[in-house]
């Protein structure tokens, strides 16, 4: 019997180093050993004894377990045929250190990185959806801090954390899960699997989770979390939307090692691509929030700049999510939309429905140029790239979208007349 990996991305490629796997991916056109692969220069795994196979070669009768790349949806033909499907978390569930899982719709990367910043001196290592693949994490580390996607949770059968921290949930990845209910079920699944341990959850789930075995701290906002870990909100240097992430990270640290070090956390630097403020030569404020790939992140960004006139770049791959909440938020703001991406026309139609001014730009460089033409040189305006959509319809990643945004700002015709 063989072990099977579905897909050849970062997660499965790291696992494959252990050897003895059958790896199924559409890249592979024929049965071959790595040594004879036409892609030998790209897939150098012959020394591990793996076989690279086309998905049509998969026979569940010859496979004792299957681990999918997280991006493989439940309807994928390989997933449908699999009989012993587990997640990477299950495969490495024998890790004896403390496991911290952090999930939610928006803010989980920042919360995970903040938690790692607080716990690194205690021997913690960060990985999974951000940082190091689980297969490459140090098995002798005292703590694993795992940014945990709904995809991985969906496929997890037995692994559980000692601490599970859930940020608020709003619709996302609906094309993968099929519905918001299934997406929400995945995020809540660890609570029902935990036989002990500590967890944090939004207060709206209190009744639904009342019979869970874990000790769950419910919160409605930053004030609730500050009370849980015994810190003074006024001493924390982060503003919305990062304040919630910061206090949750402090709560996790308090439960994990007994210390919530606000002074240390205040030295943490927010990563690029999240509400990254840029001033052009004229002093105009541009904000790179390209990592806002869902409606909740964009709404948080809009709250941040409430009171300003906002030039909002919106659009991309909406993953089947209804963007109406963003438009409802914009109805009460002084804002104009510059629509880009594959859903440009959909955004334009919704703008008409909600009575919001919109320009169909389709491409990011066009949007930047249009904004520059309309951008007054005063302190009450902001140009905000917060797309509420994924980037893969036009870019390799959200990071590339952000890099291009900054590139287009830099190359604007600075000799143009300003209003």
Where is each model-derived feature located?
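Nucleotide phosphate-binding/pyrophosphate-handling subdomain across enzymes
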Residues: 235-334
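Conserved substrate/cofactor phosphate-moiety recognition/catalytic segment
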Residues: 124-140
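Short glycine-rich anion-binding loops that position phosphate/pyrophosphate groups of nucleotides
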Residues: 70-73, 107, 150-152, 171-172, ...
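Short, basic phosphate-binding NTP loop
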Residues: 1-101, 272-274, 364-374, 383
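Residue-level signal for inorganic ion chemistry
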Residues: 19, 66, 102, 147, ...
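Flexible active-site lid/hinge loop adjacent to a nucleotide/diphosphate
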Residues: 140-212, 217-237, 393-399
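Walker A (P-loop) phosphate-binding motif
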Residues: 88-129
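Active-site beta-alpha connecting loops in nucleotide-dependent enzymes
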Residues: 3-18, 24-35, 290-356, 360, ...
């Amino acid at each position: 019997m063989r072990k099977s990996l579905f897909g050849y991305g970062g997660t499965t490629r790291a696992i494959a180093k252990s050897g003895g796997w059958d790896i199924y991916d559409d890249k592979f056109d024929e049965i071959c050993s790595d040594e004879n692969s036409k892609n030998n220069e790209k897939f150098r795994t012959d020394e591990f004894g793996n076989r690279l196979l086309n998905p049509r070669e998969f026979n569940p009768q010859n496979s004792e377990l299957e681990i999918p790349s997280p991006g493989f949806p439940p309807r994928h033909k390989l997933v449908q045929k699999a009989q012993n499907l587990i997640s990477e978390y299950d495969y490495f569930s024998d890790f004896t250190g403390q496991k911290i899982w952090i999930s939610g719709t928006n803010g989980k990367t920042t919360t995970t990185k903040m938690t790692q910043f607080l716990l690194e001196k205690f021997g913690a290592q960060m990985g999974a959806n951000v940082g190091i693949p689980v297969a490459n994490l140090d098995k002798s580390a005292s703590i694993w801090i795992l940014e945990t996607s709904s995809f991985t949770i969906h496929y997890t059968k037995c692994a559980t954390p000692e601490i599970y921290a859930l940020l608020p949930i709003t619709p996302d990845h609906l094309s993968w899960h099929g519905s918001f209910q299934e997406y929400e079920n995945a995020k809540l699944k660890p609570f029902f699997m935990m036989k002990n341990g500590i967890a944090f959850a939004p207060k709206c789930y209190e009744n639904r989770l009342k019979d869970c075995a874990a000790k769950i701290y419910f919160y409605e906002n930053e004030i609730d979390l500050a009370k849980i870990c015994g810190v003074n909100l006024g001493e924390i240097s982060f503003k919305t939307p990062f304040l919630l992430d910061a206090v949750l990270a402090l709560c996790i640290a308090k439960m994990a090692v007994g210390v919530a070090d606000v002074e240390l956390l205040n030295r943490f630097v927010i990563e690029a691509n999240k509400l990254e403020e840029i001033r052009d030569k004229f002093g105009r404020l541009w904000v790179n929030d390209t990592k806002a790939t869902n409606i909740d992140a964009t709404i948080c960004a809009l709250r941040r700049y409430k009171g300003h006139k906002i030039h909002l770049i919106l659009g991309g791959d909406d993953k089947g999510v209804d963007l109406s909440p963003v438009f409802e938020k914009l109805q009460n703001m002084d804002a104009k939309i510059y629509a880009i991406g594959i859903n440009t026309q959909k955004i334009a139609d919704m703008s008409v429905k909600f009575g919001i001014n919109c320009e169909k730009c389709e491409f990011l460089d066009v949007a930047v140029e249009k904004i520059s033409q309309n951008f007054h040189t005063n302190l009450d305006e902001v140009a905000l790239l917060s797309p509420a959509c994924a980037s893969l319809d036009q870019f390799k990643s959200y990071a590339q979208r952000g890099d291009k945004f900054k590139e287009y700002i830099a190359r604007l015709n600075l000799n143009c007349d300003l209003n």
